[in-house]
Amino acid sequence: CGIDYYTRAPGYNNESFVIYMFIVHFLIPLFIISFCYGNLLCAVKAAAAAQEESETTQRAEREVTRMVIMMVISYLVSWVPYASVAWYIFSNQGSEFGPVFMTIPAFFAKSSALYNPLIYVLMNKQFRHCM
C-alpha cells in the first residue's frame, strides 16, 4: 500500500499527487503539531510563572517540555524519511529504485501510530499509574 512511482502515464497525474501528499500529509500536520505544542509549552510556562517557582513546578515543566520535544522528534523520525524518499523519487523520475529504498521509509511512517502511546507510557508517571 503506497505510491505508484513507476506509472508514467500522463493521465495519472503522479506529480500533483506527490505534491499534494507532501503538503497535506506532511507539512500541514508538522505546522499544526508545532503550533499546538508550542502553545502548550507557552501555557505551561505561564502557569509555572503564575505559581510560586517550586521544585515540583519546575520538574513538571521540564517533564512536559521533554515529552513535547519527544513527540515532535517522533513525528519527524516517522515521516521525514517517507516524505524525503517520495520527494527524491519525484525529483529523479525515470531512475530505478529498489524495493528496500521505498519499504524502509514506509515502515517508519506506518509505525508512527506506536510512538505517541509509548512516549506517554515511558515519560508520564500519571499515565503509567492509570494503566
From Swiss-Prot:
<feature type="glycosylation site" description="N-linked (GlcNAc...) asparagine">
    <location>
        <position position="14"/>
    </location>
</feature>
<feature type="topological domain" description="Extracellular">
    <location>
        <begin position="89"/>
        <end position="100"/>
    </location>
</feature>
<feature type="modified residue" description="N6-(retinylidene)lysine">
    <location>
        <position position="110"/>
    </location>
</feature>
<dbReference type="GO" id="GO:0005502">
    <property type="term" value="F:11-cis retinal binding"/>
</dbReference>
<dbReference type="InterPro" id="IPR000276">
    <property type="entry name" value="GPCR_Rhodpsn"/>
</dbReference>
<dbReference type="Pfam" id="PF00001">
    <property type="entry name" value="7tm_1"/>
</dbReference>
<feature type="topological domain" description="Extracellular">
    <location>
        <begin position="1"/>
        <end position="16"/>
    </location>
</feature>
<keyword id="KW-0675">Receptor</keyword>
<dbReference type="GO" id="GO:0016056">
    <property type="term" value="P:G protein-coupled opsin signaling pathway"/>
</dbReference>
<dbReference type="InterPro" id="IPR027430">
    <property type="entry name" value="Retinal_BS"/>
</dbReference>
<keyword id="KW-0157">Chromophore</keyword>
<keyword id="KW-0681">Retinal protein</keyword>
<keyword id="KW-1133">Transmembrane helix</keyword>
<keyword id="KW-0966">Cell projection</keyword>
<keyword id="KW-0600">Photoreceptor protein</keyword>
<keyword id="KW-0844">Vision</keyword>
<dbReference type="GO" id="GO:0016020">
    <property type="term" value="C:membrane"/>
</dbReference>
<keyword id="KW-0472">Membrane</keyword>
<keyword id="KW-0807">Transducer</keyword>
<dbReference type="InterPro" id="IPR017452">
    <property type="entry name" value="GPCR_Rhodpsn_7TM"/>
</dbReference>
<keyword id="KW-0297">G-protein coupled receptor</keyword>
<keyword id="KW-0325">Glycoprotein</keyword>
<comment type="function">
    <text>Photoreceptor required for image-forming vision at low light intensity. While most salt water fish species use retinal as chromophore, most freshwater fish use 3-dehydroretinal, or a mixture of retinal and 3-dehydroretinal. Light-induced isomerization of 11-cis to all-trans retinal triggers a conformational change that activates signaling via G-proteins. Subsequent receptor phosphorylation mediates displacement of the bound G-protein alpha subunit by arrestin and terminates signaling.</text>
</comment>
<dbReference type="GO" id="GO:0097381">
    <property type="term" value="C:photoreceptor disc membrane"/>
</dbReference>
<dbReference type="GO" id="GO:0007601">
    <property type="term" value="P:visual perception"/>
</dbReference>
<comment type="similarity">
    <text>Belongs to the G-protein coupled receptor 1 family. Opsin subfamily.</text>
</comment>
<dbReference type="InterPro" id="IPR000732">
    <property type="entry name" value="Rhodopsin"/>
</dbReference>
<feature type="transmembrane region" description="Helical; Name=6">
    <location>
        <begin position="67"/>
        <end position="88"/>
    </location>
</feature>
<feature type="transmembrane region" description="Helical; Name=5">
    <location>
        <begin position="17"/>
        <end position="38"/>
    </location>
</feature>
<dbReference type="GO" id="GO:0005886">
    <property type="term" value="C:plasma membrane"/>
</dbReference>
<keyword id="KW-0716">Sensory transduction</keyword>
<protein>
    <recommendedName>
        <fullName>Rhodopsin</fullName>
    </recommendedName>
</protein>
<dbReference type="GO" id="GO:0008020">
    <property type="term" value="F:G protein-coupled photoreceptor activity"/>
</dbReference>
<keyword id="KW-0597">Phosphoprotein</keyword>
<feature type="topological domain" description="Cytoplasmic">
    <location>
        <begin position="123"/>
        <end position="131"/>
    </location>
</feature>
<feature type="transmembrane region" description="Helical; Name=7">
    <location>
        <begin position="101"/>
        <end position="122"/>
    </location>
</feature>
<keyword id="KW-0812">Transmembrane</keyword>
<dbReference type="InterPro" id="IPR050125">
    <property type="entry name" value="GPCR_opsins"/>
</dbReference>
<feature type="topological domain" description="Cytoplasmic">
    <location>
        <begin position="39"/>
        <end position="66"/>
    </location>
</feature>
<dbReference type="GO" id="GO:0016038">
    <property type="term" value="P:absorption of visible light"/>
</dbReference>
